[in-house]
């Protein structure tokens, strides 16, 4: 029986106009799938521990900007290839920048296990939703 991935919590979940929470994205395949499926051209937010997949580099094509945050940000910065990457200590710092953008086109697709940032993808997804409400609503 075919499982419909779109019905899982935090799997490409549109939480408001232009904002998608894909916190369930715990590997590079799901991250790249999300970018391609949405033909995504906006701001991508990535976090988590990349050690599980052990890849040397990952090319991100499509998004306008890539924001990396969390305890694993330096490891991710060494691996991810994109012309416009910036790193932050926490997600609040990213929302602080994005709140000033008129057009909100945001994909939260971490592409890695939570590592030392969160206990699991559910906590991570709820944190994103809470900050979205705090900064945008």
List PLM regions with ranges.
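Nucleotide phosphate-binding/pyrophosphate-handling subdomain across enzymes
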Residues: 1-64
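Short glycine-rich anion-binding loops that position phosphate/pyrophosphate groups of nucleotides
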Residues: 26, 49-51, 72, 107-116
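Short, well-ordered alpha-helices that flank and scaffold nucleotide-derived cofactor binding pockets
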Residues: 33-37, 78, 130-134
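Short, glycine/charged-enriched secondary-structure capping and boundary segments
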Residues: 34-35, 58-60, 80-82, 120-124
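Structural beta-sheet core signal
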Residues: 44-46, 68, 108
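C-terminal helical cap/extension that packs against the catalytic core
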Residues: 51-106
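Glycine/aspartate-rich loop-and-adjacent alpha/beta segment that forms the canonical ThDP
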Residues: 110-137
């Amino acid at each position: 029986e075919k499982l419909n991935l779109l019905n899982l919590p935090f799997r490409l979940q549109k939480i408001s106009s232009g904002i998608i929470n894909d916190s369930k994205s715990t590997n590079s395949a799901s991250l790249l799938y999300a970018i391609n499926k949405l033909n995504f051209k906006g701001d991508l937010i990535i976090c988590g521990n990349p050690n599980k997949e052990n890849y040397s580099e990952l090319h991100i094509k499509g998004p306008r900007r890539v924001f990396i945050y969390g305890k694993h940000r330096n490891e991710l910065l060494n691996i991810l290839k994109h012309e416009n990457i910036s790193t932050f200590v926490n997600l609040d710092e990213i929302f602080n920048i994005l709140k000033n953008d008129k057009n909100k086109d945001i994909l939260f697709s971490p592409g890695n296990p939570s590592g030392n940032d969160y206990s699991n993808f559910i906590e991570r997804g709820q944190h994103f939703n809470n900050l979205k409400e705090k900064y945008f609503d």
